[in-house]
Amino acid sequence: MENFTEENLHPWITTTTRVYNNVTIFPQYDDELGKFEIMVLCILCFMALFGNAVVLIVLRIKKTTLTRMQLLIVYLSVTDISVALFHILPTIILKINVYFLGDISACRVYQFITVAELYASSFVLIVTALDRYISICHPLAAHMWTNRRVHMTTALALFLALMCSLPQLDAVLVDFHGGKLCRPNLTTELANIAYSWWAFCSVFFVPLLLLIFFYGRICFVVWQSMRGRECTQSVGSSASRYVRKPIKCRISSQTSSENRVKNYSDARDKDSSRNPRAICRGVSKSKIKTIKLTFSVVACFIICYTPFFTVLMARTYDAELSSAQTPALVILSLLPSLNSCTNPWIYLAFSGKVWCRQQSQNFPRTWTQTTNTYLVELEAKKRTSFGAEHVTFASNSTARKTLNVDDTNTTALMSSSPC
C-alpha cells in the first residue's frame, strides 16, 4: 500500500481537492495512518451495529407496549444503525479502494446518504429532549403527547434531515491520478466557507442551542420541584400550629376545625401562587432516571461533535491545516462515528428502571375539596410530609369523635329524663 491522496473521512471536510486562493490543495496520507484509520472505522462499525442491535433485542423481548421514552430509544438505535451501515461502512469501502468506482449518480447518492444519517441522528436526539421537556415542564400537556404524536414528530425530524441533506446532491467526480474522487462541488473559496458554515450550524450549533434550552428548563423545573417540597413541609408545620390549639367548647369545635382547614388551605394556595410546582407531588424517580439517560446522550453528542467541528472550521480558514493529516486530526475526525457507538451502552447502563412502564401518573393537586377531603389528605400524608405531626391530627380526630359521642349521650339522657 503506497502513499496516496484520498478523500477525508467525513464528506463535510473537503480536503481532497480544497480550493484556497484559487489554488488546489491535495492532502497527503501515509500508508500506516490509512491502515490505522480503516481499522478504527471497522471497530466503530461493529460496536455500533452490535450495541444498538442488543438494545433493540432487549426492547423486543418486552411483551408490553413501549412507552414514549422506549419508543424514542428505538428510533435512536435505528438511526445509529443506519449511521453504521450508510456512513461508516461506505467510508471504509472508499478508503480501501482509494478511488470512487461508481458514476456521477452513485457519487451523489453516496454524498447524500452519508450526511443524511448524521442529520437524522441529531434531529431524533432533539425529539427525545423535547419529549422529556414536555413530560417534566408541562405535565398536563404530556398526557396528550401520545405514541402517535411521537411517530409524527420523529417522521418530521427525519424529513427535515433529508431536506438539509439536499445540498449534498451537488457532487462531482474529480479525475485524479488515473482514478476518480467523489466530492461536493465547491469550485471557489467562498463556496467552501458557506458549505462549512451550513454544516456547522445545521448539524451542531442549532441542535446544541435547542438541547441547552430544553435541559436548562428541565433542570430549573426539577430544582423548583425540590424547593416546592420544602415549602410544602414548612406550610404543613404552620398548619400544625392551628391544629394544636385546644378545643375549649363543644359548640365551637366544628367551627374551629373549619377555620383550621381554611387557614391551612389559604397558606398552601398562597405558596402555590408563588411557586406553581409546589402544589405538585414532585418529579418521580423514573423521570429523574430518564433525565439522566438523555442528559448522558446529549453530553456524548457534545463531546464527540465539538472537536470535529472545531477542526472543520479551522480547516476552512487555514490552508496549511487543511492539507495536514496527522494522527490527532484523524482521531478527531472519527469522533462523530463514535457517538453512534456510545449511545446503546448508555441505554443499557440506565436500563434498571427506564424499561419499566410508569404505573401511575402525577397530577397537580387542586384545593377545591371539602373539609373532610382535606382531613383525609392530611392524614394520608402523615408518613411522608409531616412526620410526627400525624399524632396531633389523630388526637384531634379522636377528640372530635369524643365530643360527638358526648353530645349524643347528653341528648339521650335529656330525652329519657322524666322532667
UniProtKB/Swiss-Prot annotation:
Subcellular localization: Cell membrane
Example of a GO MF term: G protein-coupled receptor activity
Primary subcellular site in the record, as a coarse category: membrane
Keywords, comma-separated and alphabetical: Cell membrane, Disulfide bond, G-protein coupled receptor, Glycoprotein, Membrane, Receptor, Transducer, Transmembrane, Transmembrane helix
Residues glycosylated per entry: N3, N22, N185
Topological domain ranges for the Cytoplasmic compartment: 59-80, 130-153, 214-292, 351-419
Protein name, entry field: Octopressin receptor
Gene name in the database record: OPR
